[in-house]
Amino acid sequence: GAPSKFIVADMPFMSYHVSVEDSLRNAGRIMKETGVNAVKLEGGREFCAVVKALTAASIPVMGHLGLTPQSVHKLGGYSVQGREEDKRKRLVEDALMLQDAGAFSITLEKVPASLAKEISEKLTIPTIGIGAGNGCDGQVLVINDLLGLDSGFHPKFVKKYADLYSVSKEALETYNREVKDRSFPSKDYSYE
């Protein structure tokens, strides 16, 4: 575990979509079985009743607005959310509604920096940005992206702080070569 860290678990797809009762049961199970400190769910006003029920049951809830990966196909792909005025307005309203429902924080993903800043200034709870500019109260990146653990596509907002993919690939190739030529394990790594 990580006793000095605050850990938030994503509620899996469809674990909070069917009913408030199912959502309570599923969130409670996640909290008990994983030992996390809070749960996060994607979506706005349509899930405010769930947020209210969970927080009433002492389950801390983080909201998630903008690009919501669990419903990416409904959104038309991995595009920036909230560029059009009506969608921008709806995201602001959804953020305020989630706050009023009891969310302790909201993740804003892949929205214009100006929108994230506007939402952050209107809320009294912290915002965490991922592809939302520097106007949020905090930032998050996927650890595999941050560490450069793969060589594939990376969204514009991802900054690779290391290239562990290349380091790992080189280490595995060296290991493979040494096993094949029998230079590993040498005496230093063997028992007599």
Predicted features by range, described:
Residues G1-A162, S166-E192:
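Alpha/beta enzyme core
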